[in-house]
Each structure stands twice: as structure tokens, then as C-alpha cells.
């Protein structure tokens, strides 16, 4: 039995908080460069994306603050740094387009999930704009209203 359940098969980690804190304009799939012990930890599901972000630096995209836990079966000398910046693999035109979008005011690159496509680890990046506090409150109010409507409809169907 697996330790965590995900909606989608092959998904190792999701950054659910990102959808709460940001308005996601678009998503893009990127490969990720990992060392041997890192890929073993990713396969074990030991990834945390909370608070992580990506940046375009010198026409390359790097993922920062993504925590990939050290692989337990390897010794302390053969392990990786859990918080090191990791290079993301994208085509040149995708990098240029992302760089143009990110230079717009208030836009950032946020990793949404890490998953496997075949045997390769992939990161889904979102081009996002930060939400204001009142936007978050509005989303919560909208969800509460939808929940109340669903309850009322269920009660009405039950009474028939």
C-alpha cells in the first residue's frame, strides 16, 4: 500500500497551496535534472514543493527551494543536498516565452506538481500571479456558497 493517495497516477508531489495563493495563468511541463540519490528519493515520494519557485537565469530555468529528502539507503557521503537548485529542461522558445511572461509585473513561475511520465520525472510549472487577501476570501466564500447549494439540493432530493 502506498503512503499517500493522489488523484492522478504517477503524481509524486502536489503543491496544493500554490492554487490557493496564486492565480495560475497557464501551465507548462518541464523535465528536471536529478542525481541518482535524488531520483530514488523522488520515486519514494519524498518531495516537498511548498514554498518553491522557478527562475529564468542566463536563458536557463532553475527550481529553487524544492526539498527532496536525502535517500536513506545511501551513506552520508554519497547523498545530495536536499535544497540545492535544480535545472529544468525546456526548449529554447519555451524559455524565451516564459522569460517574457515572468518579466510582466507580478508574474512568477511556481511548480504545481512532480510526476513521472514513463520513467522520466517531470515538473508542471504554472505561470502565476499572486492573489490578494480579498481574492482568497472571495474564493472561500464562493466555495462555501457552492457547498450550501449542494446541501440544499441534496436535502430537496431526499425529501421527495
Curated annotation (Swiss-Prot):
GO terms for cellular component: cytosol. It comes from the Bacteria. Required for rescue of stalled ribosomes mediated by trans-translation. Binds to transfer-messenger RNA (tmRNA), required for stable association of tmRNA with ribosomes. tmRNA and SmpB together mimic tRNA shape, replacing the anticodon stem-loop with SmpB. tmRNA is encoded by the ssrA gene; the 2 termini fold to resemble tRNA(Ala) and it encodes a 'tag peptide', a short internal open reading frame. During trans-translation Ala-aminoacylated tmRNA acts like a tRNA, entering the A-site of stalled ribosomes, displacing the stalled mRNA. One of its GO terms (molecular function) is RNA binding. Belongs to the SmpB family. GO terms for biological process: trans-translation. Pfam families: SmpB. The keyword DNA-binding does not apply. Its main location: cytoplasm. This is SsrA-binding protein. It is found in: Cytoplasm.
Amino acid at each position: 500500500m502506498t503512503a499517500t493517495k493522489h488523484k492522478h497516477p504517477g503524481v509524486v508531489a502536489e503543491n496544493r497551496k500554490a492554487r490557493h495563493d496564486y492565480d495560475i495563468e497557464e501551465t507548462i511541463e518541464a523535465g528536471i535534472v536529478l542525481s541518482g540519490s535524488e531520483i530514488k528519493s523522488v520515486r519514494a515520494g519524498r518531495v516537498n514543493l511548498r514554498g518553491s519557485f522557478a527562475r529564468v537565469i542566463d536563458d536557463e530555468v532553475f527550481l529553487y527551494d524544492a526539498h527532496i529528502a536525502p535517500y536513506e539507503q545511501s551513506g552520508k557521503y554519497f547523498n545530495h543536498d536536499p535544497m540545492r537548485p535544480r535545472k529544468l529542461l525546456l526548449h529554447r522558445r519555451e524559455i524565451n516565452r516564459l522569460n517574457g511572461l515572468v518579466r510582466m509585473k507580478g508574474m512568477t513561475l511556481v511548480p504545481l506538481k512532480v510526476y513521472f511520465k514513463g520513467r522520466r520525472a517531470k515538473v508542471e510549472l504554472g505561470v502565476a500571479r499572486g492573489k490578494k487577501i480579498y481574492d482568497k476570501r472571495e474564493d472561500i466564500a464562493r466555495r462555501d456558497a457552492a457547498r450550501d447549494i449542494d446541501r440544499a439540493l441534496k436535502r430537496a432530493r431526499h425529501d421527495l
